[in-house]
A protein has these predicted regions:
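N-terminal signal peptide c-region/cleavage motif recognized by signal peptidases
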Residues: 18-20
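C-terminal partner/receptor-binding element of secreted or periplasmic proteins
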Residues: 125-160
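Repetitive helical segments and hydrophobic/amphipathic motifs
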Residues: 13-16
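Compact, glycine-rich, soluble single-domain proteins
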Residues: 45, 49-51, 59-105
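Bacterial N-terminal signal peptides that target proteins for export
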Residues: 1-9
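Stable alpha-helical elements in mature extracytoplasmic
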Residues: 40, 44, 64, 143, ...
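Terminal, regulation- and interaction-focused segments at domain boundaries
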Residues: 22-55, 160
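Beta-strand/loop substructures that line and gate deep hydrophobic ligand-binding cavities in soluble
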Residues: 106-137
Length: 160
């Protein structure tokens, strides 16, 4: 249990550091994965699908590296997983249709120039403090905390 708490603390700290020399953006949580890009994606999606009884689902993936290759360009692995919970998102979109531009939620599995694999996603606080208000929706700190706990579990299942 203590190692999970420590790992999460380190992940949040790492979110504040630039993993490839670029400035890290606030609200992003980046965790190292001990697996390949493909396996990390599979494990992340399996962890989301395991919560389907609670409404969670994986919608699709977007492989940026494959798109680059089709256009004669090279890009290290960069796959975005679109996922969400219509039970939570739909009522918010009913109140503010423009929220649909920012949801479903996304997670990025990527490989840096040294071959290290990372999982990056938005924090609950970022979603509640910036995304929701941008669409005229109230912030909900309790929802942000619950979302962070949910994603902590999913991310650990994908990366450990």
């Amino acid at each position: 249990m203590m190692s999970r708490v420590l790992r999460w603390t380190v992940a949040v700290f790492l979110a504040s550091l630039p993993p490839t020399g670029l400035a890290a953006e606030p609200g992003l949580i980046t965790m190292p994965s001990k697996y390949s890009v493909e396996v990390t994606i599979q494990r992340f999606e399996a962890a989301i699908r395991a919560k389907s009884d609670q409404g969670w689902m994986v919608f699709t993936e977007l492989d940026h590296a494959a798109a680059a290759e089709k256009n004669g360009l090279k890009l290290p692995a960069r796959t975005v997983i679109f996922f969400g919970n219509p039970r939570g998102g739909t009522p918010s979109m009913q109140k503010s249709p423009t929220l649909a531009i920012d949801v479903p939620l996304k997670a990025l599995v990527w490989q840096d120039d040294q071959g290290k694999v990372w999982l990056t996603f938005n924090s609950g606080a970022y979603l509640q403090d910036y995304v929701y208000p941008r669409h005229g929706l109230p912030s909900n700190p309790a929802a942000a905390t619950a979302f962070d706990e949910f994603l902590k579990q999913v991310a650990e299942q994908a990366t450990e």
